[in-house]
Amino acid sequence: MSQKDRLGTGGRINRAIPLTFTFNGRTYQGFQGDTLASALLANGVHFVARSFKYHRPRGIVTADVAEPNAVVQLETGPYTVPNARATEIELYQGLVATSVNAEPSLENDKYAINQKLSRFMPAGFYYKTFMWPRNMWPKYEEKIREAAGLGKAPEVLDADRYDKCYAHCDVLVVGGGPSGLAAAHAAATAGARVILVDDQRELGGSLLSCRAEIDAKPAQQWVEKIEAELRKLPDVTILSRSTAFGYQDHNLVTVTQRLTDHQPVSMRKGTRELLWKIRAKRVILATGAHERPIVFGNNDLPGVMLAGAVSTYIHRFGVLPGRNAVVFTNNDRAYQTALDLKACGAKVTVVDSRASSNGALPAAAKRQGVTVMSGAVVTAASGKWRVSSVDVASYSNGKTGGKMQSLPCDLVAMSGGFSPVLHLFAQSGGKACWNDEKACFLPGKPVQAEASVGAAAGEFGLARALRLALDAGAEAAKAAGYTAAQRPVAPQVAETVEGALQPLWLVGSREAAPRGPKQFVDFQNDVAAADILLAAREGFESVEHVKRYTAMGFGTDQGKLGNINGMAILAQALGKTIPETGTTTFRPNYTPVSFGTFAGRETGDFLDPIRKTAVHEWHVEHGAMFEDVGNWKRPWYFPKNGEDLHAAVKRECLAVRNSVGILDASTLGKIDIQGPDAVKLLNWMYTNPWNKLEVGKCRYGLMLDENGMVFDDGVTVRLADQHFMMTTTTGGAARVLTWLERWLQTEWPDMKVRLASVTDHWATFAVVGPKSRKVVQKVCQDIDFGNEAFPFMSYRNGTVAGAKARVMRISFSGELAYEVNVPANAGRAVWEALMAAGAEFDITPYGTETMHVLRAEKGYIIVGQDTDGSITPFDLGMGGVVAKSKDFLGKRSLSRSDTSKEGRKQFVGLLTDDEQFVLPEGAQIIAKDTQVSATDPTPMLGHVTSSYYSPILKRSIALAVVKGGLNKMGESVVIPLANGRRITAKISSPVFYDTEGVRQHVE
């Protein structure tokens, strides 16, 4: 297998260990020490990806975490990793990777047609293009979602294991480059406990990618010496292959350490990734800097790379990315890349936007025979699958002149300056400050116990960076309580004279940007200079708004390469300075972190307990589909013979209305209330009076918060003179108990009353329907179930199927119903006895969905669905349960001007003109003659709170809250839908079925 672009010697790879890998179905070879990116380049593979929006051919741009293009799907099945950067993937035997965002293949991507449609797809096109006709939006959405995204999410469970650990140290150094090593060495030799974090497999940082000398020896020897000394010290921990991705308060830094990603899948054992939470007395950020690309025409072609990345591939991996190179720069650093290429036998031409430079590197390049074109810029690159030539024009005083010539080439190495990596500094609370001389943002005053060193602090010269890093390390150790007897001696590094950088944010004029070839700022998201200029013309002035409008800085690289260029172009368009324009927010995570890292080993059910009723297993055995209600697993519906939700609910509803059904209501909250002041407490908590409630009777109550808004509801039964049992909503049980305890403990500590949650003590079954009395009579002989002996809203003690029971005659469906409460350990036996007793009536177990339909047919509310914390009892039309002669919590708030004003949203029913159309819950309601505007706010009357199809009524029904709704009975309103359709409905009473309430009193 030929690696045609692999140099014969050099690089930090092990040529004795060849490795075979597969990319897009083709087999290639690399060496141990390669990354996937370097191995692909060694094999002459430059076209590796398609861009996000236009699906343009893309190649490898960088050699580090900032890579925007070479994003791949790594491995398959349980080990697959989407959106992995090829520049960070260490090569291993048998590695399998595929390009993302290309269908069916990279070369024959069907979405490549977007390149021809690009003029119709500028920034924000999706806000403008798919607005009409509105009923086509579902079709648009389907296609947009099909085209969106990069990699594919895993479809099977992750096979790897993840762990967490915690550490404390005196000094945490982030970055294992020259400055990080120097700072860690100074702190460690002073006796401080040091943790050094670096994201590479080996320490050295930028020194691995250049020919620098330290102490008159190759810089790598100095790296090896310092690393060896650090590893000998007992209080030093070195975390390689580790990324510090978050900096929180009080010097808490989160780090993910990759332990097995560099190994073949078949050989991985133990933990894949380890999440470190490190608390440090002092933090030193030696995070380096990102080289900036230059914004010129077709700068996204494969073969257009950063100059520093080219040097990295040469020195670190022994790869020559091109043999006929154009180095395009505005600074001296790129001349080192020109020298590196020349030393490898490549033909090199430097295009320098500056008129001249008196630096040492340009002089050295000229001595080596490198052609230098000063006062010139690359205006555009050409090529199909790889760059083949560039156009060069003159450049002077910030203006691009006429075309000078075309240069054939197979590589463009660009360098537009350097941007310190400020992400962690900004996350710590620090603010970045613009430096005109260095044309970059630098860290400002530290907010936490932190210092930035090296390129992260804008110190791009090696000699000065090392000296300052040693000082920072010693100062950090001293601040942590350690003072070295002798500071490490600063190594000797030859000072290099550098010419001044000349900022170059955009080649060509802003006016010409929309007309020429695309000049990309953000490679991954296809954000061109013209998009930013368009956003500015359309009124977007905040850089945060421009980011969201254009998608600049989105994606896996989060703007590491392009954001500074984009901010500068925006600043020019707005006539502002870059500091005035500002930066976008540096949010964690610095690089993508796997979900597994955060989850650790806790990949199963949450610690929050799953609550199951006493008959849960019966439900499972009989095929129930479940939904989560609070912490409870409740049967949602019981499908038979392949029924879907709608068919099952229709059958269950009709069974209850025409015969008998049974519901497991054990999840309802139950609070046992006992004591001489029990009635007093209930009077305070509920809006209605409780003094005269007889033993053996039940009463419905509404509970309000201090603002007079409905907080919870339920039925409370009086078991004895000083003994009550309160029921609450399933999801509100804990909240209500806490509410009661809060008032008892803080405001009424002298009340003689005790509360106990007994929800789990009782199994509760609602036997519902016109045949329900006949069912319960068969299993309970010691209770007279006649209407006179056992009236509605009453309670009786008895024995049901051999178990002591509390039976209540209450109904949440409007049908004759009995609620049977038995000790939980007898629950299944009693349930099965009830099922057997009801067999002759075809008794039907039903779930929460049917319960919702039945109660909606009767207009009964569900707190939290038909209320939202802004609804009073009067809004619900339930003023009848609000006492006028007693006080209760929230009463005073009911008389406030806002809660008693006209035009509040009130609880009503809705009947659609199209009887078969079920309104979406949450849909907004507008007046019939109101037109929806795409630009102006539309006045809303209210919204739909509950909506179902009623099998007994054979039509749709809905509950809603509408402004002044109780005075608008019979009026028509409109519900506009997302697809543009307008549904007309009439406001009605919320009681749709059995409006006289006779069915719950059936003989």
Located regions from the model:
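Residues forming anionic-ligand binding surfaces in small-molecule and nucleic-acid pockets
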Residues: 197, 289, 540, 650-666, ...
